[in-house]
Amino acid sequence: MSQTITLIKDKILSDNYFTLRNITYDLTRRNGEVIRHKREVYDRGNGATILLYNSTKKTVVLVRQFRVATWVNGNQDGMLIETCAGLLDNDEPEVCIRKEAIEETGYDVGEVRKIFELYMSPGGVTELIHFFIAEYHDSERASIGGGVEDEEIEVLELPFSRALEMVRSGEIRDGKTVLLLNYLQTSHLMD
């Protein structure tokens, strides 16, 4: 017998910006035992992220911005260095990430390559993130970036070796960014 899930109750606790739901479900184990669970699930929609790299200059483009959740959790100034990212908002992942790249970094990149899709915090968050990389060139800079009207985003062009050192030193602590930097390193695209 395989494990089965039966939804008992799905209650919306909050739907201000994203949706917080209280889910009650029965888990029937393989041995037939039924266990009732109650969990809060945060549904913020799915997202996409991209690491821009230049294999000639050996650089990457990251952004620095305030992230309130990190501030609440002890990040003193709330600033986080990360890859460009955004929510899909009914767009296809590649369409979304191209828009975000222009808005946040100012780069209108050519070919983008999807690497993988991952759940970053599946214990309580529904978000599935689509991960991309793209080579960028100075000639593709369409604007200064910095985000839309309610965002304050600093664009960082860093030597790839410096970005890797920032992961080791703890200056970069964003999971999606660490994954993409490690992917770039192990793929040997910067060799």
From Swiss-Prot:
A motif (Nudix box) lies at residues 86-106. InterPro entries: NDP_pyrophosphatase, NUDIX_hydrolase-like_dom_sf, NUDIX_hydrolase_dom. One of its GO terms (molecular function) is hydrolase activity, acting on acid anhydrides, in phosphorus-containing anhydrides. Its EC number is 3.6.1.-. SUPFAM superfamilies: Nudix. It catalyses: GDP-alpha-D-mannose + H2O = alpha-D-mannose 1-phosphate + GMP + 2 H(+). Keywords: Hydrolase, Magnesium, Metal-binding. Mg(2+) 2 binds at residues 100, 104, 151. GDP-alpha-D-mannose binds at residues 17, 38-40, 67, 85-87, 104, 127, 150-151, 176. GO terms for biological process: nucleoside phosphate metabolic process; ribose phosphate metabolic process. Pfam families: NUDIX (PF00293). It is an enzyme of class 3 (hydrolase). Its cofactor is Mg(2+). Belongs to the Nudix hydrolase family. NudK subfamily. In the dimer, the N-terminal domains are swapped between the two monomers, such that residues of both chains contribute to the active site. Homodimer. Nucleoside diphosphate sugar hydrolase that hydrolyzes GDP-mannose as its preferred substrate, yielding GMP and mannose-1-phosphate. This is GDP-mannose pyrophosphatase.
